[in-house]
Structure formats: structure tokens, C-alpha cells
Amino acid sequence: MKRRQKRKHLENEESQETAEKGGGIQRIHRDSPQPQSPLAQVQERGETPPRSQHVSLSFHSSYKTCVSSLCVNKEERGMKIYYMQVQMNKGVAVSWETEETLESLEKQPRMEEVTLSEVVRVGTPPSDVSTRNLLSDSEPSGEEKEHEERTESDSLPGSPTVEDTPRAKTPDWLVTMENGFRCMACCRVFTTMEALQEHVQFGIREGFSCHVFHLTMAQLTGNMESESTQDEQEEENGNEKEEEEKPEAKEEEGQPTEEDLGLRRSWSQCPGCVFHSPKDRNS
């Protein structure tokens, strides 16, 4: 019993000592001054904290990337228009440079091109407006058609109203002309180059467009030109290699081969072919 009481007494004393030590450490930490952050020190002084350089740099770099992405989406390039200079003979378009006017164009076709400067967005179609919408807007509605039919049925063929009505103006492409520029897509002949360019650029207003034809034609001609340049480079490289191989072959021909050396040695070592000196002959 006494031993148990002593053990309990010792354990109680040890627990009290540890509790006192822990309280002293906490008091020391509370009493010691804590280091203040630079922002807190600046706020106590009443000064405005300076902006960090890292934030400004990151914002500047993000602005640059946005601007570059916008610039990449636009590309300035020229569009090529393919045409042929023709002259009219009895309503038939014949070649500009043919001596005989009755000669057909298929025998001596000569296609020319002109660049039309414009800004084209990369990855976008040539025209955002569909052809169907344009045709539906230009075509008259059902009510307008009925009204026109009624007016035609009411008017008699011999009435003065029909005689006084002006005739419709013939389109420019039906007017006979001596010479002009023929579009290679739709084969229509235009009087001036400006009219041809306007037709290619804004032909969608008329219900159809030759814009896509000229774009694809330019791509095909560009591919053919690149292939021809590659073939020429390959031919030049092949000719250079042949020229380098020719002197090497000549050097090999000039040097005696091992077979020739072996034949010479065999003839010199032949017992029947012994050459005597003039002294031996005199003796």
C-alpha cells in the first residue's frame, strides 16, 4: 500500500512539473515580439504598398498573346482572276491574237491572269451569305405573282397601256460588242477589266458567283508551279551528281587494275622470254 501511494505521489509531481514547463514556454512565445510582414509595416506607416513587378509582367505577356492571336486570324493576300481577251465575230467570241477570225478558241487558248488585292480571313468561306437566301429575297412572293397575273389578264393586247409601257433594258452581257474580256468560269464577255473584277468579287448579287472557281484555279496553278520547281531542282541535283561521278570514273580508268599487273608479272617471269644484255651476246 505504501509503495502504491508513493508511485501515485511521484506521478502527480511529474505531471505538475510538465504542466508548469509547458505554460512557461507558452508565456515566452506570447511575450516575444512577432516579426511583422512588410505589408503590415507599410500600412502602420501610412504608405501605399508598391505593386509587385511579377503581376505587371504577367499581365503584359497575356496582353501580347491576345494581340498576336488576333493578328494571326487575318492575312492580306491578292486574289487572281483568270480571263481571256477575245473579239466578237457574228456573235461568237474568238481569240484576240488569231490571224483567222473563224478559228476556234480551242486550238490556241491563251489564258491570262490579274491580281485583285483584298483582305481575306483565313479559314472562312468566300461569302458568308448563302445563295439560297439571296435568291429567295430577289424572287417575288406568291401575292406579287398573283397581282402581276391579274394585271396581265386585264390588259388587252391592243390597249394603249401596253404600247406605252417601256421595254425592259437588255443586260450588259447580252449587248453585242467588238472585243472584251471573257471570264474563264462562266464564259461571259465583259467590256472592261473593272467590270470583270466586279463580277468576280460581287457576283453573288446576280445569283451565282465565280469567286470559288478563281480561288481553286489559283491553288491548282500554285501547286503545279511548286511541282515544276521541285522537278527542276531534282534535275539540277542529278546533273551535278553525274558531273561529280565522271572525273572519278576517268581516274579509275587511268589507274591499272590488279589483273593488268598480274599479266605483266607473268610475262616478265616467263622462262622463254629471257632478255640478254649486249655483253652476254658478245661473249
Swiss-Prot record:
Pfam family name, one: Spt46
Residues recorded with modification Phosphoserine: S268
Disordered: region residues: 1-54, 123-171, 223-283
A single GO cellular-component term on record: nucleus
Single Gene Ontology BP annotation: transcription by RNA polymerase II
Residues found modified as Phosphothreonine: T170
Disulfide bonding pattern of the chain: none
Family: Belongs to the FAM170 family.
Domain notes: The N-terminus is necessary for nuclear localization. The C-terminus is necessary for transcriptional activity.
Alphabetical list of PANTHER family matching this protein: PROTEIN FAM170A, PROTEIN FAM170B-RELATED
Protein name: Protein FAM170A
Organism from which the protein derives: Macaca fascicularis
Encoding gene, per UniProt annotation: FAM170A
